[in-house]
Structure formats: C-alpha cells, structure tokens
Amino acid sequence: MGAVLGVFSLASWVPCLCSGASCLLCSCCPNSKNSTVTRLIYAFILLLSTVVSYIMQRKEMETYLKKIPGFCEGGFKIHEADINADKDCDVLVGYKAVYRISFAMAIFFFVFSLLMFKVKTSKDPRAAVHNGFWFFKIAALIGIMVGSFYIPGGYFSSVWFVVGMIGAALFILIQLVLLVDFAHSWNESWVNRMEEGNPRLWYAALLSFTSAFYILSIICVGLLYTYYTKPDGCTENKFFISINLILCVVASIISIHPKIQEHQPRSGLLQSSVITLYTMYLTWSAMSNEPDRSCNPNLMSFITRITAPTLAPGNSTAVVPTPTPPSKSGSLLDSDNFIGLFVFVLCLLYSSIRTSTNSQVDKLTLSGSDSVILGDTTTSGASDEEDGQPRRAVDNEKEGVQYSYSLFHLMLCLASLYIMMTLTSWYSPDAKFQSMTSKWPAVWVKISSSWVCLLLYVWTLVAPLVLTSRDFS
C-alpha cells in the first residue's frame, strides 16, 4: 500500500516537471521570485553534474568505464615505461569521463545560450522553455551525456583540453566580476546600516573583516615566498608573487584615493581586501600547476616542511616525501582544486540569487536592467493566495527579465569547462604519467587571469572618472 501511495506521490510531480519552475519548487519556496527559482534549478543541475564527474574519477568506477566500447582508446595515455599499465586499458578513464560529462554540459548550456538570445520578457515563448519543461530538458541532457561517452577518441581530448583551458580562463574572470559585485554590495549594505544607526558596531565589523582578509593575504604571501621559491631558483614564482603583491598594493591605494572617493564614495578597502585575497589564491593556484616539482610542493610535503622542525629529532634530518602522481583512475584532487571548487560554488549560488537592480558591476558592463517593476507582481501573488489558489513563485519578469537568459547560460557553459579543468587538475591529455602535471600554458592562463582580474577591479574604481556622462551612484 505504501508503495502505491509513493507512486501516486511521484506522479503528482510529473505536471510540475513539464511546467515552470514556479510549480517545481512551489512547496519549498512559495514566496520566491520565478527568476531566482529558475537560476537555482540550473545551478543545482550543474552542481549535480559536478558530483557525478567526481564519482566518475573514483577507482570503483574504472571497471564499468572500461566496458564502454572504444573508451580505452586515445587521450591521457599511460606509457609502459612509466607504470605497469593495465593491458585492457592504458588510459586514465576517470579523466576521460570528466571530459565527456563536461562536454555534454557545455553543449547543453551553449545551445540554450543561443536559443535564449534577446529574450526580453517572460511573455516570450522561449521564456517558457527556459523556465519550464524540466523533464524534457533533463532527459535531453542525460541523452547528450550518454552519447558523449561513445565519441571516438582521436584528437577529442587534446582539442577539448584547449577549449576547456580557454573557457576556464574566461570563467575565472566571471568569478572576479561576481566577487567585485559581492564586495561592493556587502560594503554598501554595511555602510548604509552604519549611517542608519549604531555606527560603532558596523564600523568595527567592516574593520574586522577588512583586516582579516588583508592578514590572510599577507600570510599567504609569506608562505608562498617560503615554500614556492628557492634562493637559487624558481625565478618565475618570485616574479609572480612580487608583481601580484605590488599590483594589490596599488589597487588598495587607488580604492581610497580622494579623487576615487569623491566620484565613488562607496569604494573602500573591504572590496580591495577581498580582491587581494582572491588574487593571492590565483597566484598559488597558478604555481601549483608548474611542471617543476622542486618549485611546486604538494600539500603533504608542504605540511611536512612546516611540521618537520618540531617532529624530527635533533640529530636527524627531516625527510620530505616526494610527490606521488595521481592514481590511474585519476581520483586525486589537489588542495587548490578543492578551494577552487568551493569558490566556484559560492559564486554560482550568488549569481543565482543576485538581482540586476542592486548590482554595481552591471552598471559598468552595461548589462544591468533597473527598469523592472516588482510591485505589480508581488501584489498579484498576494491576491492569488487570498483567492485560495495554490501559492507559486511570483513571475516578476512580465514587464522585463531580471537577467540576461543568454548570458546566464553562457556563464554556465564556461563554468562546465572550469569544472572539467579543475577536476582534472589542468592535466594535459598527452602528458606522461611519471610527470603528470599541467604544462606551462595552464600556469600562464591562471596568472594572466589574476592580472586581468586586478585590472578589471581597478577599472570599476576609475570608471566614474573616465565615463563622466554615466550615473554610478
């Protein structure tokens, strides 16, 4: 009897799966806006695919992946001279699986990006596809994923590696835009509360977080100089750390310059501290991809070198373990990759709940839309509840969309490529197993992204001085 009731309970969700997001999540968040709920669902789909990609890297999945016809051919080859390769499969199948899943996700979101180009309101028939028909969209996505596993090897992995590296670099810049937006909104919110009442409390809170971020950045710089450089080597690392430290100091000084404060009073050191810490992370992440292991210690050797002086006997020499290559299933995630995924999740969730009406960065990128009126939609939602109708998420896009559907899907497409590169540690498909690490192009992509990030942040500060005809208040 319980099973029958369960079937009918699941069947009740079928109409919602074929309709809009307002129905799909109406019982969970009945007072939410349709634009927010839709983005959260897409974000959940992307996060779920990330989990699936990670599971595919586990050793337990290797047996099942080997059974796929032709899947053990081409890309991420293991040479006999490097390791006793499995005679049935000499390929890092875990990495190949991640490439296939990310390919399916990227294609799915790229097609939707093209399909949703120039959608202005929810009255557009294409908006119904964007906000609804979840059953068919999920089924199509699963179909693309399954089909991608049967793509012939050949040059697929090598070509997709280049595409993934470019897409991941672009998404790093998008993360910076979101972080700048978040920092501006955070600072503006707390400054407003400080002006409204209890200024000492909010001033202390701003000062505490700003100081904490700068202290963490200084500690990071010290650790990078100590463990990622050598007196007689690692010249590139010394250059990367030094130039980014100088650029962060310059950006912080610009943020509190009187001319900047005059045209943009909301700018301050809180935003600069967030960007500085993110830049230091990008610097560490870039150096963690260097091929030279002597200038790129892994996390375990990093910790050992810190604790060795206290753990080793006085008359002995502490032995630092040599880094070990990833397992053949490709299941190892480096520490910087975990942090990268954590930052990715935060930015993805923020991009799903933010609105264009309170975005500082949208004004700089000409992508904001402040003309959307929410009063009518809120009133209609309340009247539905009074009439006894089922409460659903409010359609707040009848007069104009709250965000660009096309750009949102393009961001998710780039995010899929970023996940692919992160889960595979930016490894090149043609790298030998005994030196399984990223090549210099991946290092330069990340470090260049950190420079562009800083330049982009400085632009958000000086834009009011340059574009005097625009309103940045």
Swiss-Prot record:
The lineage of its organism: Eukaryota, Metazoa, Chordata, Craniata, Vertebrata. It comes from Pongo abelii. Belongs to the TDE1 family. Signal peptide: none annotated. PANTHER family: SERINE INCORPORATOR, SERINE INCORPORATOR 3. Restriction factor required to restrict infectivity of gammaretroviruses: acts by inhibiting an early step of viral infection. Impairs the penetration of the viral particle into the cytoplasm. Non-ATP-dependent, non-specific lipid transporter for phosphatidylserine, phosphatidylcholine, and phosphatidylethanolamine. Functions as a scramblase that flips lipids in both directions across the membrane. Phospholipid scrambling results in gammaretroviral surface exposure of phosphatidylserine and loss of membrane asymmetry, which leads to loss of infectivity. This is Serine incorporator 3. Residues 1-96, 154-159, 225-239, 351-406, 468-473 are extracellular. InterPro entries: TDE1/TMS (IPR005016).
